[in-house]
């Protein structure tokens, strides 16, 4: 008799995805972040669902409803801070996941990579809209500044912005629609995750060497399930330490001031995970140019498979490319720091140089380094 796990139409899908899935034996802990992202998504959907039961998407009561959740709802404070800091963990895992893909050449699985880029955009949109919901000062002004960027689009820009706002400024209509979108997007993201996994399981996982590992596979369960659980425990420990000891560490104090359209905060800035893109946006003195640079800073990931000039897939045995990769990481950290600083000397010039370096590394230096390495190996 066949095992029901392998014969039943529903359990068969789960079995082939998480239990009997052939996995390379050599994949390191950098491959844990996919499962961690799945868990982050589940945590965000669950905490978000319970928060939505007590939240009101109305400009008059939104700020007070969040205060009510923290003060009066049973364990509301932990729900709120798990959700807010869970977003930070989500982005830490996301950036590490993308970095892993860049380093080990996982982007050569173009379908999986492109769905991943769409997922990144969807998660960024969701996080931005979620940041608007508490209706504090930074929520309101962040929404105003970021939606206003669309007015840089020639001809249709102004109409587009007013259409998104549902009026002539960020107001009740904007908050209501942002709540609706913030609620629905995670479920769309969940469906996209399925597509992401579908494409991944067509090819199988990459591994640190970048060499096909068809002759050396092990079942996903129990080996990688145990390994993923270790990663999960470490991530949950970090998240709970953050939530219990310093829940406001990554937030902005200005968001504890109710939104006031008549009073602009001294430094309008997004959450820390968008600061690198915000720094690139600010470093170009032209509005349309800045918006294009902002979009391209993420969209540039889509052309990385086309820029792969190396004869090797992974960077494991390519020291010049490795140096450039870590320079890119340092550059992104620099941009993140600059994004949180005021627009004044010397931060302006540092931001501009870091932005130029960001695009130069990806578009020019990395492809050239790969060609150089090919030449040095006499390939």
Swiss-Prot record:
GO terms assigned for molecular function:
metal ion binding; ubiquinol-cytochrome-c reductase activity
Q: Which GO terms describe its cellular component?
A: mitochondrial inner membrane; respiratory chain complex III
Protein's membrane topology: Multi-pass membrane protein
Q: Does the keyword Heme apply?
A: yes
> Where is the protein found, in the record's own terms?
Mitochondrion inner membrane
Entries under Gene3D superfamilies matching the protein: Cytochrome Bc1 Complex, Chain C
* Biological-process GO terms, alphabetical: mitochondrial electron transport, ubiquinol to cytochrome c
Q: Per the annotation, which location comes first and is thus the protein's main one?
A: mitochondrion
Quick one: which residues bind heme b b566? Answer: 97, 196
Classification via PROSITE patterns:
CYTB_CTER, CYTB_NTER
Question: Cell membrane as a keyword?
Answer: no
Write down how the cofactor binds this protein: Binds 2 heme b groups non-covalently.
Q: Which UniProt keywords apply?
A: Electron transport, Heme, Iron, Membrane, Metal-binding, Mitochondrion, Mitochondrion inner membrane, Respiratory chain, Transmembrane, Transmembrane helix, Transport, Ubiquinone
- Other remarks? Heme 1 (or BL or b562) is low-potential and absorbs at about 562 nm, and heme 2 (or BH or b566) is high-potential and absorbs at about 566 nm.
Q: What the protein does?
A: Component of the ubiquinol-cytochrome c reductase complex (complex III or cytochrome b-c1 complex) that is part of the mitochondrial respiratory chain. The b-c1 complex mediates electron transfer from ubiquinol to cytochrome c. Contributes to the generation of a proton gradient across the mitochondrial membrane that is then used for ATP synthesis.
On assembly, the entry states: The cytochrome bc1 complex contains 11 subunits: 3 respiratory subunits (MT-CYB, CYC1 and UQCRFS1), 2 core proteins (UQCRC1 and UQCRC2) and 6 low-molecular weight proteins (UQCRH/QCR6, UQCRB/QCR7, UQCRQ/QCR8, UQCR10/QCR9, UQCR11/QCR10 and a cleavage product of UQCRFS1). This cytochrome bc1 complex then forms a dimer.
Q: What is the recorded name of this protein?
A: Cytochrome b
């Amino acid at each position: 008799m066949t095992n029901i796990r392998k014969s039943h139409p529903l359990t068969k899908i789960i079995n082939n995805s998480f239990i009997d899935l052939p996995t390379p034996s050599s994949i390191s802990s950098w491959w844990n972040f996919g499962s961690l992202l799945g868990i982050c998504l589940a945590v965000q959907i669950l905490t978000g669902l319970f928060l939505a039961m007590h939240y009101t998407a109305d400009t008059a009561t939104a700020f007070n409803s969040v205060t009510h959740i923290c003060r009066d709802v049973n364990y509301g404070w932990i729900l709120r801070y798990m959700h807010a800091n869970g977003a930070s963990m989500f982005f830490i895992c996301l950036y590490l996941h993308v970095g892993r893909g860049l380093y080990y050449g996982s982007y050569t699985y173009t379908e999986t990579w492109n769905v991943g880029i769409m997922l990144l955009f969807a998660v960024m949109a969701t996080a931005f809209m979620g940041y608007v919901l508490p209706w504090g000062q930074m929520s309101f002004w962040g929404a105003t500044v970021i939606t206003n960027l669309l007015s840089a689009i020639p001809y249709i820009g102004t109409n587009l912005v007013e259409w998104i706002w549902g009026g002539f400024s960020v107001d009740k209509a904007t908050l209501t629609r942002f709540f609706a979108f913030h609620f629905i997007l995670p479920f769309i993201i969940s469906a996209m995750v399925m597509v992401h996994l579908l494409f991944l399981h067509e090819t199988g996982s990459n591994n640190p060497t970048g060499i096909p590992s068809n002759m050396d596979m092990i079942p996903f369960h129990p080996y990688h399930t145990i390994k993923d659980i270790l990663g999960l425990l470490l991530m949950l420990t970090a998240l709970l330490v953050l939530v219990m000891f310093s829940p406001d560490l990554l937030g902005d104090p200005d968001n504890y001031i109710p939104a006031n359209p008549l009073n602009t905060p001294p430094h309008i800035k997004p959450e820390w995970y968008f600061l690198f893109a915000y720094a690139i946006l600010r470093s170009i003195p032209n509005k349309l140019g800045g918006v294009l640079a902002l979009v391209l800073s993420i969209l540039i990931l889509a052309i990385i498979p086309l820029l792969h000039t190396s004869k090797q897939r992974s960077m494991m045995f390519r020291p010049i490319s490795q140096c450039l990769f870590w320079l890119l990481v340092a550059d992104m950290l620099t941009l993140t720091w600059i994004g949180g600083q005021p627009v004044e000397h010397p931060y302006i010039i540092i931001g501009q140089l870091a932005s130029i370096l960001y695009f130069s590394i990806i578009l020019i230096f990395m492809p050239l380094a790969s060609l150089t390495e090919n030449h040095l190996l006499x390939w």
